[in-house]
C-alpha cells in the first residue's frame, strides 16, 4: 500500500520472486506509474544483476490498483508504506480489515512507530507485524521484523517465510 519510493521498491522486491504477484495500491493511475520501477530495473540490467527477460518478468508480476478493497481482498501479505503518521497508519489498517481475508498478514514498514500502537484500531490485532526494510529496500537484504504485543507466533513465522521467499534476510 503506497506507491512512493519505498512502496515501489518493495513491489520490485516481492515481484522478483517468480511465485509472488504484487498489487501496488496507489491513489491515482498515472501513465508514468511504472517509470520509477523501470528505472531501478534498468540499472540492475546494466550492472548484470538481472537480465532483460527477468526485468520483463518482474514487471509482469506488478499491477496497480486505486481501489483499496480490490487491492487487498485476495492478498496473503499486505505491507503498508504510508506516511509516518500514527493516525494515518491506524485508520488504514482498520479500513483494510474490512476488505481483506481473515488470514491475511498486515505488515507495516515503519521505522520508528510501534506496531502495537498501529494495531490499536484493528479487530484482529494478532495479524499485525512490523517489517522494516532498510532503504533502498530493493538493494539491502536485511529486513527487521518487529512483533507487536499481539502478534501471533504463526504470523511472525509466516512473515519471516514470505521475506525469505522474496530474497531478504529477516531478523
List where the protein language model places each region:
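Short beta-alpha connecting loops at secondary-structure transitions
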Residues: 24-27, 143-147
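Internal alpha-helical scaffold of NAD(P)-dependent oxidoreductase catalytic cores
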Residues: 124, 145-171
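Hydrophobic beta-strand scaffold residues
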Residues: 22, 106, 170-171
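A structural alpha-helix within SAM-dependent methyltransferase catalytic domains
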Residues: 12-15, 97, 119, 160
Amino acid at each position: 500500500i503506497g506507491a512512493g519510493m519505498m512502496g515501489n521498491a518493495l513491489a520490485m522486491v516481492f515481484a522478483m520472486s517468480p511465485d509472488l504477484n504484487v498489487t501496488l495500491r496507489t491513489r491515482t493511475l498515472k501513465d508514468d506509474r511504472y517509470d520509477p520501477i523501470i528505472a531501478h530495473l534498468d540499472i540492475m540490467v546494466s550492472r548484470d544483476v538481472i537480465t532483460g527477460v527477468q526485468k520483463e518478468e518482474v514487471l509482469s508480476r506488478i499491477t496497480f490498483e486505486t481501489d483499496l478493497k480490490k487491492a487487498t481482498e485476495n492478498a496473503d501479505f499486505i505491507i503498508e508504506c504510508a506516511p509516518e503518521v500514527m493516525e494515518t497508519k491506524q485508520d488504514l489498517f482498520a479500513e483494510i480489515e474490512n476488505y481483506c481475508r481473515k488470514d491475511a498478514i498486515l505488515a507495516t514498514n515503519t521505522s520508528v512507530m510501534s506496531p502495537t500502537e498501529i494495531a490499536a484500531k484493528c479487530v484482529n490485532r494478532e495479524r499485525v507485524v512490523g517489517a522494516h526494510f532498510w532503504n533502498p529496500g530493493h538493494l539491502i537484504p536485511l529486513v527487521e521484523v518487529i512483533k507487536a504485543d499481539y502478534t501471533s507466533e504463526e504470523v511472525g513465522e509466516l512473515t519471516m517465510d514470505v521475506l525469505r521467499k522474496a530474497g531478504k534476510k529477516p531478523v
